């Protein structure tokens, strides 16, 4: 069982690091509060666009396709990291590691083919499922109630 002095002696550097980092954060926040501008007025919270009066809303509406691209990038980027780690240790992993990496790549390719098949990577405008034909109902052929 460790005594308190042994624990303190073992973890003193981490405690000093925590105290210094918390103190530095508090010092920066206090400095910003003291030195920061104190403008209070009608136009304080309005967005500033290089001296031009802002028109409309400041929010941009982005297509969901951009979020899909970002999500695909993150997914395939993380998998590239796994493959890089495997490629640096290929000699130590042997044939078992090669087979595991091949299965991993096949799963990635299956996922990519699935995304292409469902049209997740298609940037063209959506096509209609059916053609809309104009109706040929005339007023003369209509039944009277």
Curated annotation (Swiss-Prot):
One GO MF term attached to the UniProt entry: NADH:ubiquinone reductase (non-electrogenic) activity
Catalysed reaction, written as an equation: a quinone + NADH + 5 H(+)(in) = a quinol + NAD(+) + 4 H(+)(out)
Locations listed in the record: Cell inner membrane
Membrane-protein topology: Multi-pass membrane protein
Example of a GO cellular component annotation carried by this entry: NADH dehydrogenase complex
Residues that span the membrane, as ranges: 14-34, 66-86, 96-116
EC number(s) on file: 7.1.1.-
Xref: InterPro entries: NAD(P)H_OxRDtase_bac/plastid, NADH_UbQ/plastoQ_OxRdtase_su3, NDAH_ubi_oxred_su3_sf
Origin: domain of life: Bacteria
The family this protein is said to belong to: Belongs to the complex I subunit 3 family.
Quaternary assembly: NDH-1 is composed of 13 different subunits. Subunits NuoA, H, J, K, L, M, N constitute the membrane sector of the complex.
Protein's UniProt name: NADH-quinone oxidoreductase subunit A
């Amino acid at each position: 069982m460790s005594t308190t002095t042994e624990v303190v002696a073992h973890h003193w550097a981490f405690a000093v690091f925590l105290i210094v980092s918390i103190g530095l954060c508090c010092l920066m926040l206090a400095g910003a509060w003291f030195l920061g501008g104190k403008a209070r007025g009608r136009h304080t919270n309005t967005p500033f666009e290089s001296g031009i009066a802002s028109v409309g809303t400041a929010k941009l509406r982005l297509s969901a396709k951009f979020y899909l691209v970002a999500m695909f990038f993150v997914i395939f980027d993380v998998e590239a990291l796994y493959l890089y780690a495997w490629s640096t240790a290929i000699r130590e992993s042997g044939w078992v590691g090669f087979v595991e990496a091949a299965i991993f790549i096949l799963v990635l390719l299956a996922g990519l083919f699935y995304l292409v098949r469902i049209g997740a990577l298609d940037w063209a405008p959506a096509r209609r499922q059916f053609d809309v034909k104009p109706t040929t109902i005339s007023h003369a052929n209509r039944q009277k109630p």
